[in-house]
Structures are given as C-alpha cells and as structure tokens.
Amino acid sequence: MNKVRVRFAPSPTGSLHIGGARTALFNWLFARHHNGTFVLRIDDTDTERSTEASYKEILAAMGWLGLDWDEGPEKGGQFGPYLQSQRLELYRREAARLLNEGKAYLCYCTVEELAERRRQAQAEGRPPMYDRRCRYLTPADRTRLEQEGRQPVIRLAVPETGTTVVKDLIRGDVAFENATIDDFIIFKSNGMPTYNFATVIDDHLMQISHIIRAEEHLSNTPKQILVYQALAYELPAFAHVPMILAPDRSKLSKRHGATSVEEYRDEGYLPEAIINYLALLGWSPEGEEEIIPLEKIIEQFSLERVSKNAAIYDTKKLTWINGHYLREGNLDRITRLALPFLQAKGLLPDPLPEKDYNYVRSVIAAVRDRVKTLAEVADAASYFFTDVTNYEEKGIRKHFTRPGAAALLDEARERLATLPEFNAQAAEEAYRSLAEGKGISTGQLFHPTRLAISGRTMGPGLFEIMELLGRETVLARLDRAARWIRENLA
C-alpha cells in the first residue's frame, strides 16, 4: 500500500457527535495501523452555521479522546491551511478552470424559478431535477441575464448518459446512473464553494489516499467522482462505514440520551472507554473480547473487518465498559478525574488542600468497584464527606425496625469506643465477638451499622468504611442513628 493519508473533516456547526467521533476514530486507527498520516481539516464553508465556539469544541473533544492529528489546526503541515474558509482562492481557481474548459457553466435561474419548475415536474410525475436550461445559453443570453442583475451559481456539466461507479472498500461496487444526477451546484452565488466541490479539491491537494466516512455520504460520492474526473484528478479509495442506529433502529438522536462527546465527558465517562466502545461499532476484532487495549485495536484494525450492516448503539454496554476502566484504571488518574464531580456536588473544596488528597484517593479506591461513571462516584462517596442525615427507606424497614435495634447500636458503639487501636481488622474482630456473645448472626449487627454510618444498605466493605471515616465519626453516627430510632420508631 502506498503512503496512507486519511482525514477527518467535520463542519463546526455543533458539538462533535458520537457518530462523527466514530468516523474520526476509524480514520485515526487506519492511519496508525499503516504508519500513515491522520489529517484534521475543518470544513467551515457553511458561513451561516459555522461558529468559532463549535470549532474550539471539536478540537477539544478530539484532544480529550486522544485522537491526535498529525496535520491540521494548531499543528500545521505542508498542505495547509486546514480551514476551508482560508482556502477559497484555490476553489475559485479550479472553478474558473472548469468554466474555461466547458466542464461547468454559469446558471442564472433564481430560487423562485427553480422552486416553480420543481413543483411543475412533480405535478407531471417527473423527477424534480434541474432542467439544464442554462447549460446551453448563448453569450448574448448570458449578457442579458447579467444585465438583469442576476447573480449566477456555477454548475457542473454532468454527463447525461453512462454510469458512475463507486468502488467502495466496504460495500463493493455501487453504480449510479448519470441520468439521475443533477447538474449540481459547485459554487454558490455568494462566492462560496459547495461541499461536494471543495472537499474534492482539498482531498486531492492534501494527497488523501483513503476517504473513510459515514454511509450517509455514499450518495454524495458519485457527484464527487464526477468532480474528480472533470478536474482530471486521480481518485482516492473510498470506504463508507455503517450507520449508527438507536436500539429501536431509528436514527440516533437526543431522545436516546447523550449524543455528543462533550455530554459523555460531562457525565463522567472516560475517553478510553468511549474509544473502546466506538471501535466495536461496525468493526469486529479477531476474538470475542469486548475490553480491548488501544494498542491491540490499532494492531488488528482493518477495513476488511468493518461490517456493511448498521451498528446498534447500546448505552448500557458503553456504561459497562466505562465501569471496567474506572475499576482498573490508575487510581491517581481516576482520583484527579473524579475531583471536579465531587467539587461540583459541594462535597470537596476547590482547590482541594494537598493534605486531603490521600483521604480522597482512599475513598475513591473504596467506592470505584461499584460505580460505572465518575458522576456516580460523587453519589457513592457522599457520606465520606458529609454527615448522614437520611437513611434509605428499605433499610429502615428491614434493619431499624427490629426490636432492640437502638440498644444493639449502643452496644456496638461501646465496643468500638474501647478499642486500643481503631482500624478495619480490630473493628471486625470486635463486631464478630459481640455477635457471637449475643448469639445473633453477624448480619443482624453488620446491616444496621452500615445503615447508621452510611445511610445506605449497599457499598464498600463495612469495616473499610469504618476505618476511612475514623473512630470519632463512626461513634457519632452510631449515636445519632440510635437516637433517631428511639425518636421515630419507638
């Protein structure tokens, strides 16, 4: 294979959608697998919808995911600039060449005229295509129309017969009859190129070898091939990756939950989990595993293992994968990532005093096995940082309503108060001794204690919680719970 050069070319008209992130990832993986070049280009010719905020957000999302680009904004490269809005002269030059060679023409039809002709064609049962009337204008016709003050667009003169074949590396050959393709606009009357024109020129000048993009772009590809041919450019390879659908097989949208990378980041998902999950949307690894290190994905990635069939987006699986990376990730890194979520809930000061870091780290080590996102860390860990003022209702019914529950907590409190050393092992030994002496099961003692000191019925090991909270806090919470039982359940 010749030198691989691929690109991801988002439009800065919104956040980086999860589908766009998957396309970027597949391009990045293909480049890394082949020791090629991954180019980031910003297709910002839609001046009405493109914003600086979206541009910055896309770059931030790409950086957060770890999809580093070799050429592009903030990196530069020999084929820049990498924003289409800074390349307009290149497009104008090539459009002028097509006009001079008779491969494109000026069209003076107004929006109103085109709309009326479309309505008429539909009423007569004809395809609502442009009727090519400006294709054969005489110089005198053009002069007259320009004198009327009409601002022309430029249309490509599409062959009226024959077939344009997309040789797709995933879908095989896909044929389009030229008779069904409009003489489409390549330059708008406002002096801006259309997507199907500008992208061809950029991909050619940037020496892109493979265009890997979403299936919804397949219908644009014959038009782009016609532009390649008109400009006498060599064709790149095309690969259209499958659509991503919601579980009900509808188009993925906000009603199915988060759809942008930024939203997932803010909900506490880890970039490595999103990368792992997105890689599996349409691509199959060599084995059956679902947790795959990035190095292994790069090593195995190929377009031959990309499916033609739509991928079903399963948030539950993403969340499960995220839970794995939370449990297995470097504890200091997970702690740093969790801090903003704890601070946003008012559980920790911002900035965190350095003296408190080890305690927070230990708490996260205790709770991370039972959470799936960083946002869940804040909820799971809250009682380590704030007083327990409420108890779970099901826990109250099951554990606090037992006869003698308050007295049992009092006895447990006294045992803990007299321990020479207060740690998990000593607390557990004291509790087991107390349960044995009273002839009750350990659960009858452990469960009400957990509820008393955490407000929860589930969580980390009871004695791990005790050691982290410390003797003073544990005793105070046992006192409060016993008092609450007497005041509310007596």
Curated annotation (Swiss-Prot):
Biological role: Catalyzes the attachment of glutamate to tRNA(Glu) in a two-step reaction: glutamate is first activated by ATP to form Glu-AMP and then transferred to the acceptor end of tRNA(Glu).
Annotated HAMAP family: Glu_tRNA_synth_type1 (MF_00022)
Lineage of the species this protein comes from: Bacteria, Bacillati, Bacillota, Clostridia, Moorellales
Pfam families: Anticodon_2, tRNA-synt_1c
One GO term (biological process): glutamyl-tRNA aminoacylation
SUPFAM superfamilies noted in UniProt: An anticodon-binding domain of class I aminoacyl-tRNA synthetases (SSF48163), Nucleotidylyl transferase (SSF52374)
Organism of this sequence: Moorella thermoacetica (strain ATCC 39073 / JCM 9320)
Record GO terms (molecular function): ATP binding; glutamate-tRNA ligase activity; tRNA binding; zinc ion binding
Motif 'KMSKS' region boundaries: 251-255
Keywords for this protein: Aminoacyl-tRNA synthetase, ATP-binding, Cytoplasm, Ligase, Nucleotide-binding, Protein biosynthesis
Family of this protein: Belongs to the class-I aminoacyl-tRNA synthetase family. Glutamate--tRNA ligase type 1 subfamily.
Motif 'HIGH' region: positions: 10-20
Protein name according to UniProt: Glutamate--tRNA ligase
Catalysis performed (reactions): tRNA(Glu) + L-glutamate + ATP = L-glutamyl-tRNA(Glu) + AMP + diphosphate
